[in-house]
Amino acid sequence: MQIDMKGKDVVCTQELSVDEINALLKLAKEMKAARYGDKYNQLLKDQTFLMFFFNPSLRTRISFEAAATELGGHAQFLEPKTMRLKKTSNGVEVQAGETIEDAAQVLARYACGMGIRILETSVENYGDGNAILREYAKWMDVPVINMADDKYHPCQGLSDVMGMQEHKGDLKGKTILMTWAHGDLARSYCSVHENLLITSRLGMNVKLAFPKGYDLPEEEIAKVKANCEANGTKFEITNDPDAGYTDDVEFVYSRNWFGPDFYEIGKEAEIARASKMTDWICNQERMDRTKDALYIHPMPVDRGKEVTDEVASGPNSIITDIAENRLHTQKAIMAMTIAGMKIDI
């Protein structure tokens, strides 16, 4: 079967078919193996990819710039504060400026595609970032790639499973533990949602652990449940920090995320609350109860809070491998959606 994704937006892996996910992963692995060869280095020749950052980053900006360069193109950094864009607050205009409709259509004339990064600190309500990204995609006739919004992070999800497959092969039937952890960063849901969605799509058993009061949005939990049901796999939830670490778990993902009331109480109150729950940490004692599990994390890691140094820097940590894979999965996305590469699976 040949997979053609030319012109497709990539907003969330749940909106891709499993065949499209597998095609992207196949190409990313091929690109990683032939990184410095000539096979792919002219795919974006003389083309510009725009990177629109409402929020800062380390891995995302550098990996997208490197991806465009290695495909023969150029990535241009944009910030909203340098552009005269219209701003609204809960539907009320607070700053006059250009509408998304107008800005998006103009940007599409200049570029082969655009990535957008807009997290919770740039919006007032959960889902607003994703809605803004989709509004740009609506008005642009070139591919829009989600570089992380307040709901989803498809590039991270693809990179997670690529690293997991590299170390343990086919993921079907294997078990992952996604566990909340305390910390000082008040993190959004995007990477957590994406990992839960893509691992359940690819046939994994999923365990989810979090303290009471840190439930994930029900709409995303419903999708994970449906994915597991469709694959005949298990989905379990616990509110015990120890219960998820069992002898069938082959991957552990410990990460902080904020509570459902974050937008009401604010970042400082959220950090004060979360920092008290010190039992919620991934340590070696807990990892020893698993099936020699690998430790994964999207980074940046809040060491000593989300995970101990012993685990994060230990032999079973694949966090740096996954971070590298951001480059390769993003090259694959750009190659298929922008350059129009077709992949046989």
How should each PLM-predicted stretch be described?
Residues 43-49, 172-174, 292:
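Phosphate-coordination loops involved in phosphoryl transfer and adenosine-cofactor binding
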Residues 38, 42-50, 56-165, 303:
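Phosphate/diphosphate ligand-binding glycine-rich loop within oxidoreductases
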Residues 292-294, 298-345:
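Adenosine-phosphate binding glycine-rich loop
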Residues 125-146, 264-290, 315-316:
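A short, gly/pro- and small-residue-rich
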Residues 1-62, 66:
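Positively charged, low-complexity intrinsically disordered leader regions
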Residues 54-72, 165-255, 260-261:
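Glycine-rich phosphate/diphosphate-binding loop of Rossmann-like nucleotide-binding domains
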